[in-house]
Amino acid sequence: MTQVPLLALLLALPLWQGTLLAQNAQEPTRDAPLAPAPVGQVFDRFAALQHTDGELVGAGIDYRARFSANGAQFTPALGETAPVEFPVTLRGVAYGRGGAEQALPAGEPTYRERTVSYLRGTVEEIYEVRPEGLKQSFVFHERPAGRGDLIVAVQVATQLALQTQNGDAVTFGNEFGGVRIDAVLGIDALGRTCKGSLSFAGDQLQLRLPAAFVDAAALPLVLDPMLGAVIPTNATGRNLDPQVAYDADLGKYLVVWWRRLSANTGDIYGQFVNRETTGGADLSGGSVVIRSGSNSQRARVADCSVRNAFVVAWQDVVTVTPLPTHRDLHVRAVTPTVLGTTFPLAISSADEQGLEMASNATESSSDLLTLWIQAGYVYQTTITVSASLACGRTAVYSSTSISGITAVRISRSGGVANRNLVAYLTSGGDIMTRLLDGVIQSNSTQTWYGVRPYTSLALDGDGENWFLAATMLEVGSTTLNDIVGMTFGWRQAGNLHVRQNATTLVANPGVQDHRPTVAMSGRNAVLAWTQGSTTQHLGLRTFGQSLCAPCEDPIAVFTGASGQQVVACLAAQASGRESGATRDDALLVWQGDNGTASALQAQRWTPADGIATQVAPGCGGLTATAVAECANHQGSSHLALLRNAPVGATSWLLIGFERRDATGCGPCVLVPELSTSFVFGPTATDAYRNASWSIPIAGGSQVIGLSYYQQWLVQDTATPGCPAFQFDLSNALQVTIQ
């Protein structure tokens, strides 16, 4: 190994900047920062069908469908203004030429993918679950005998009144909305089509095709009407409280939410979203009905990596006299192909609510830490997931000794050893934090008092570092908020978490900044938040997880209509066990809710916070790790970090643009060319076993795509990787500026 007196090679920042600007980017366009990329109309294509809790259930954008021997029940999502559900049940009962005289026998439904079939003798009654409604078909494999028009009689059962009918459509409804049946079409085996008609009398809908088309049709002959929901402008069948998680092995996100069907019913739905590399241009990955038939609300989702599954939890509003109205908690495992059984997580006459779950990204455990609020106290347990995707839980116990907790948050990315940080918001506006590991051992609770009351919070972490964003009342205001940030680190000695920094993240005087959500993107944290009151905007920005410093300029992702409430959630691919080097993006999901409609939208986001690729492992007994933060061309916050070295260890940082891979001192490989490298040091690691250097990046967009090599030397007199010089080497990184 080349011998150079390291202490003589102290770096001057102007020299670093000059050398940086003299480099040539090998592929500057490849690593340019990307604007937010839309996912596409994923939620506009929501359509699901599967067995759920013993029922064959389907759903589209604005309806639910159930299928049984009694027929197909179509329920429009009319929202909380409707006191009850108003379904329409359809069943083909007879057919014939010139009149419906031939009875259609009863039958049980069968299904494949999103199509339900009833075999009724030689006639097949089919329902295709589509996003916009049910497509009903009658398939004739034999030409019906006789003369005259082909008529199919469909029995209709509903509390809705007949509102309109003509030869093209029939509408059933009331003041809350209704159902429309229209678009009768005949199709033969050669693809020839003929427009039909329909009429309603008594309790029967008659579908009709002209005799001439029936006589000449190539078999099989299909008669196709279409069922869709009629949702008035004042309906409130909203999609609410979305949350998203990511699984690396599946290569998919799962977005969950709940839909209000009536004042006392709500369903839980899910939409898989492919990561870009597995889904191509079409990112929709399948839809699922997770819970149906109760008053289910506030869905939550977490990843269970070892099972290649997601765990979805929700709260059911229960009204059973003489018990008071309260909320119970339920959970089930979900994959793209399997829906696990529902497990009652917390069932009592008490009101359990505000549930949150942490993902488990390890491959050694299927335990997911779970917390909720009951009577102002926080309770916690561990959800277990078996190989058959059956959920269970361990004992439930109180996580706090004080009452008055109004919100609880837990880091959702899983992280190292299933180690998680929990944060509680008190009624007095303080934040309390506690460290939990995979077996629910915890350290003491710490309380953080703001200069003004905190009003909400969001949290994520990787098991060693955590990023917390909280809203705090603006100076002189009782309603407007700013957003502040705190970072926390894990100190192995004593199994403690310690706050490393607190700073303002978003502050616009006189403007409401609120509803933060956070996801770890590997080395950094992505923050999304809502800005504004009457007209609300959705902002997005990447921050370093060490000092809460911004890595890049904020992005305005979405602007809502006047009066629309914008609420977002985030998950990054790094949260599903992928590293910062392999993750491609994060998924941002939000609802735009105006009180009468609440559409879900999503956008893909690739943080331009630099690309760090390990090119050589470390050596020696200290196992210190090199990390790069905010390697962005706007990089005034660019940091080179050393983590997990002993407290007080002397270290030097080497940065070079040329690669040497020098060997000859034990197993160590010194990657940067030492003779042309810049050296920062010496410095000592802090009480949290970390060291860092701030290395600003100047030059603007002309430095995008430039790469340099980063490696640390750490003094080690006990087990040195390089005995001749008594030091260890950290892993070496190739860092590319974005």
Annotated model-derived regions:
Residues 68, 139-143, 155-159, 210-212, ...:
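Solvent-exposed residues in well-ordered beta-strands and their adjoining turns
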Residues 24-66, 226-607:
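Extracellular, repeat-based ectodomains that mediate carbohydrate processing or recognition
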Residues 116, 136, 150-152, 196, ...:
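Hydrophobic residues positioned within well-ordered beta-strands of beta-sheet architectures
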Residues 1-5:
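Positively charged n-region of N-terminal signal peptides that target proteins for export
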Residues 7-18:
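Bacterial N-terminal signal peptides
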Residues 23-228:
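Residues that cap or anchor secondary-structure elements
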Residues 606-738:
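N-proximal, solvent-exposed segments at the start of the mature chain
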Residues 79-80, 143-145, 157-160, 215, ...:
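Acidic glycine-/aspartate-rich tracts in secreted/extracellular proteins
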